């Protein structure tokens, strides 16, 4: 049994070698010749999986180690009788922590408290729900917009997008990319929406590049609209609008979900799905794969305020470490993908062990996802 895996999927060689012969290949582009005798293909979002790639090939199963699936023609795979699995929620925590890192940086730079801001969350799936929970743990007001969930009658106080635009100080997008249909998200943030944002609003896109109309956004910024922008995803990746990059406050190369834990979850989820598909079901404990974190433990004295939270968050991950490298190489062919391929190890907040002498601080940090304990001061 021959299994092709994206060379940038961590732990893929070791895990899938339990099931067959593993060959690691680049994801963009996939070497088509390798597909001629392969039984399974494991990809990331950079690989377009469709009829033109797989027609006439012996592939029986495709797995994507990503939450999003807009790069995969699922309908064709089903028609062709090819098994498929994604990894929903694998990087949700990572994306939430990316958003927090960005917001805390902007809050420090611009001198505001997040408690004085209302956050509008567009898309309330794995990422949006977790983001809402952490913001509300901090006492920060949120507004939710998710028409598909609202129409299904899912639990939640869902509002219209117009209402979020009117009332939110921060608007953050966490939707799939739907190019048509009743829940179309292509250019959901169009020129009209962008112009309607509150003065000084923060716009964040960490889902799919085309959810925000990049040309319209650049037009508004060039005209002097007072707006802070955080973009992790771009229309036309791996190409991007270099002029737009110069105008945004934070720009990164589609790495919001790139924690070691998130990547490992993606790999293990598709590994478990494929092992079940071939009748050799196996389960993997994530902590058996991950290395020890860089920081062993730290001690926190007193209550948790925003500056202290910012220091803790940026100790684990400061988004500026990914903004600067992109600006240096933007527009150079191949460099966007190189930044992703050679991405520095990044951990999640749970890797940081925090000893607190304040019980409320320990409790709050645990709700936020840190590994925190309360030890009273002596």
Curated annotation (Swiss-Prot):
Gene Ontology annotations of biological process type: 'de novo' pyridoxal 5'-phosphate biosynthetic process; pyridoxine biosynthetic process
Keywords: Cytoplasm, NAD, Oxidoreductase, Pyridoxine biosynthesis
SUPFAM superfamilies: Formate/glycerate dehydrogenase catalytic domain-like, NAD(P)-binding Rossmann-fold domains
Reaction(s) the record says it catalyses: 4-phospho-D-erythronate + NAD(+) = (R)-3-hydroxy-2-oxo-4-phosphooxybutanoate + NADH + H(+)
PROSITE patterns: D_2_HYDROXYACID_DH_1, D_2_HYDROXYACID_DH_3
EC numbers on record: 1.1.1.290
Predominant cellular place of this UniProt entry's protein: cytoplasm
Role of this protein: Catalyzes the oxidation of erythronate-4-phosphate to 3-hydroxy-2-oxo-4-phosphonooxybutanoate.
Similarity comment: Belongs to the D-isomer specific 2-hydroxyacid dehydrogenase family. PdxB subfamily.
Protein name: Erythronate-4-phosphate dehydrogenase
